[in-house]
């Protein structure tokens, strides 16, 4: 009996769970159905695939007015002297003559009054600099000459070396050499005399001395 009661309870619980699960599944949102990838066409290809592409295109694509998106360039090849430049943001076209870059720059510089004024100012400055430098140069030269002329007067005079000093030094050198030569000759004479006699007392220089 207990087993039958427990099995009946389990069955009732399972039925309740199934019912709850079915309720939640029914409440789910319906999924959006998307067609095959071949049915979708890129926006950039509109009008390039012919009338068949427009026929198969959806309604929101056909409602799009493409007027003004592209400009017809039929008259571009006729006038070679003008080039249409489309700006990236404003979409405005400006007609410019077909000229080389150097001539365009020259024309723009001639037409601008600010550049003319700046060129005049630079010319004036250069002329003023040239005149000021030319006027300063002679002034600087005269100032340098005055400084050179006043330079020796401010310093004490240095006495010139006399030639007599040089002569005296030469004479002393000669006398010193002669005195040395005489001393050497005396020593040589004494040594020779001693070798001959064997004593110093017999020399006439030491005859009057009592020390020996």
Swiss-Prot record:
The keyword Cell membrane applies. Residues 106-121 have a biased composition (Basic and acidic residues). Residues 53-65, 192-202 have a biased composition (Polar residues). It comes from the Eukaryota. GO terms for biological process: pollen tube growth. Expressed in flowers and pollen. GO terms for cellular component: apical plasma membrane. Residues 51-212 are annotated as: Disordered. Transmembrane segments: none annotated. The keyword Membrane applies. InterPro entries: CRIB_dom (IPR000095), CRIB_dom_sf (IPR036936). It is a peripheral membrane protein. Keywords: Cell membrane, Growth regulation, Membrane. It is found in: Cell membrane. Interacts with ARAC11/ROP1. Over-expression of RIC6 in tobacco germinating pollen reduces pollen tube elongation. Functions as a downstream effector of Rho-related GTP binding proteins of the 'Rho of Plants' (ROPs) family. Participates in the propagation of ROP GTPase signals in specific cellular responses. Is involved in pollen tube growth regulation through its interaction with ARAC11/ROP1. This is CRIB domain-containing protein RIC6. It comes from Arabidopsis thaliana (Mouse-ear cress). The gene is RIC6.
